[in-house]
C-alpha cells in the first residue's frame, strides 16, 4: 500500500513543468526557507520571539538526531533504489525512512506552534507540503513522511513539556545576544568640553 500511494503521488510528476518546478523548489529550498524565517524572527522579533526561535531550532536538531538513530537500527531503501522510479532530481541512495527534510521542517514548525500559533500553523502547513514534495520528486515513500511527522510531534511535545530544562541556556543565549546588540547600537552621549 505504501508503494501504491507513492506511485499515485509521484505519478503526478512529469506531466506539468510548473508543478514539477514548484515541488523541486520546495524540496530543495524548504530548509533554507525555514532558516531565513527563523533568522527574520530572531532579528526583528522581541526577546520572547528569540527564545521561541532557539527552542524551535533545538527541537529541529533533536528531530534530526532521532532520525539518524532510527537509520542505525532500520534501513529502508529509497523508492528509486527499490523500484524503477524516474526522480525529478538526483539524490543519494541513503536511508529513506524517515525523511530528514520533513522531520526538520515539521519539528521546527511544531515547536513554534506550541509557542506561537500565528507563526506555527503556516510553518506546519509548509512542513507538510515539504513532505509531499519529497514524495512528488521521487525521494520518499508516504510512510517516510508519516514517520517524520510522528518523530516531529513526539520531539516537539517532549521539548515543549520539558523546556524548563533548556530555559537557562536559552535565556543566556538571548541575554548575551541582546547585550551585544545594545552595546553596538548605543548612541554616544554628547559631552561638553
UniProtKB/Swiss-Prot annotation:
It is a multi-pass membrane protein. The chain crosses the membrane at residues 24-44, 53-73, 119-139, 140-160. SUPFAM superfamilies: Acid phosphatase/Vanadium-dependent haloperoxidase. Its main location: membrane. It is found in: Cell membrane. The gene is bcrC. Keywords: Antibiotic resistance, Cell membrane, Cell shape, Cell wall biogenesis/degradation, Hydrolase, Membrane, Peptidoglycan synthesis, Transmembrane, Transmembrane helix. Belongs to the BcrC/YbjG family. InterPro entries: P_Acid_Pase_2/haloperoxi_sf, P_Acid_Pase_2/haloperoxidase, UPP_Pase. This is Undecaprenyl-diphosphatase BcrC. Induction: Expression is sigma M, sigma X and sigma I-dependent. Induced by vancomycin and bacitracin, via sigma M. Expression is maximal during early exponential phase and decreases during stationary phase. One of its GO terms (molecular function) is undecaprenyl-diphosphatase activity. Pfam families: PAP2 (PF01569). It catalyses: di-trans,octa-cis-undecaprenyl diphosphate + H2O = di-trans,octa-cis-undecaprenyl phosphate + phosphate + H(+). It comes from the Bacteria. Bacitracin is thought to be involved in the inhibition of peptidoglycan synthesis by sequestering undecaprenyl diphosphate, thereby reducing the pool of lipid carrier available. GO terms for biological process: cell wall organization; peptidoglycan biosynthetic process; regulation of cell shape; response to antibiotic. Catalyzes the dephosphorylation of undecaprenyl diphosphate (UPP). Confers resistance to bacitracin. Disruption phenotype: Disruption results in a marked decrease of resistance to bacitracin. GO terms for cellular component: plasma membrane. Its EC number is 3.6.1.27.
